[in-house]
């Protein structure tokens, strides 16, 4: 057998094995939160766009939600605005929220749309303001003061939490064979614009759409056990236990908590996976073993 024939046979075998998984997700909604290192790598960005295009061509209804923290920080520095933090969280004043909206909804959003469109699909860039899709309220965050051990309220300015999601526009776009690319910016009923954590925003969107899967592309392979080995699958109860016993710690805690909240809103399964792996989305959805940690009810 020639090398060309062997390669063709291998590709055919891969497609054959992927078929049952393609059928499983046909006509289902999959929300993908795109962030981390992959957003800063041109080739990984192209591979991600190709994955999203292939999902659509396979009959899946993908929705992309993206972050952009490093890009926001870079723009603030460029404009001579000092980034302020409270308890490790960015404080977003009026001037900052205007820049956040410009970077997320204006710059990054359109770059992702262009990448997907270059793969032959029809993507459209939106944020929570469009079609009154998402309404937010000022986030209520607290922290324990390390000196006094007293809980205090953090004033993060125009940092919000999604409290209302209307899926009407998203359903319309799905029927129109379009791929929504969403920036985590939303209005409040008070007339202010709010910057929302992209993970939280993605969880709210996935919950409202009763998504089959919510994928979080991160810079880590997934949830690790005490021996630093990847855990393939967890139930919500098991995930809560890992947080309680300290196995899940640091920045992974809010990530796992967001996964749990999404499942409680009706998402069938949430996956934390490494976005630095080329075609991580396809590996997770269309292969037997997946590519990260799946959290299920």
Curated annotation (Swiss-Prot):
One GO cellular component, as annotated: cytoplasm
Repeat in keyword set: no
Keyword check for Nucleotide-binding: yes
Binding residues for substrate: 68-69, 90, 195
Pfam family, one: AA_kinase
Enzymatic class: transferase
Entries under NCBIfam families matching the protein: argB
Role of this protein: Catalyzes the ATP-dependent phosphorylation of N-acetyl-L-glutamate.
Stated name of the protein: Acetylglutamate kinase
Gene name tied to this protein: argB
């Amino acid at each position: 057998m020639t090398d060309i024939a062997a390669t063709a046979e291998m590709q055919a075998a891969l497609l054959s094995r992927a078929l049952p998984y393609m059928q499983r997700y046909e006509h289902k909604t999959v929300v993908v939160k795109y962030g981390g290192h992959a957003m800063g790598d041109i080739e990984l960005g192209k591979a991600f766009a190709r994955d999203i295009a292939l999902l659509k061509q396979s009959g899946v209804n993908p929705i992309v939600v993206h972050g952009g923290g490093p890009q926001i920080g870079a723009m603030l520095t460029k404009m001579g605005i000092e980034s302020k933090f409270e308890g490790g969280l960015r404080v977003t004043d009026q001037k900052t929220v205007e820049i956040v909206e410009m970077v997320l909804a204006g710059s990054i959003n359109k770059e992702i749309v262009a990448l997907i469109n270059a793969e032959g699909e029809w993507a459209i860039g939106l944020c929570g303001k469009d079609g009154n899709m998402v309404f937010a309220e000022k986030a209520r965050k607290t922290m324990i003061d390390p000196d006094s051990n007293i809980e205090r309220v953090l004033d993060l300015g125009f940092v919000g939490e999604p409290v209302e999601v209307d899926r009407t526009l998203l359903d319309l776009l799905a029927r129109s064979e379009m791929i929504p690319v969403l920036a985590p910016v939303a209005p409040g009923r008070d007339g202010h614009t709010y910057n929302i954590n992209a993970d939280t925003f993605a969880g709210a969107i996935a919950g409202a759409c009763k998504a089959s899967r919510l994928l979080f592309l991160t810079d880590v392979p997934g949830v690790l056990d005490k021996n630093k080995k990847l855990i393939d699958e967890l139930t919500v109860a098991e995930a809560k236990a890992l947080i309680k016993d300290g196995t899940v710690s640091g920045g992974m805690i809010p990530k796992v908590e967001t996964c749990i909240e999404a499942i409680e809103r009706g998402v069938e399964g949430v996956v934390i996976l490494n976005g630095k792996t080329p075609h991580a989305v396809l590996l997770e959805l269309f292969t037997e073993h997946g590519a990260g940690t799946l959290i299920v009810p």
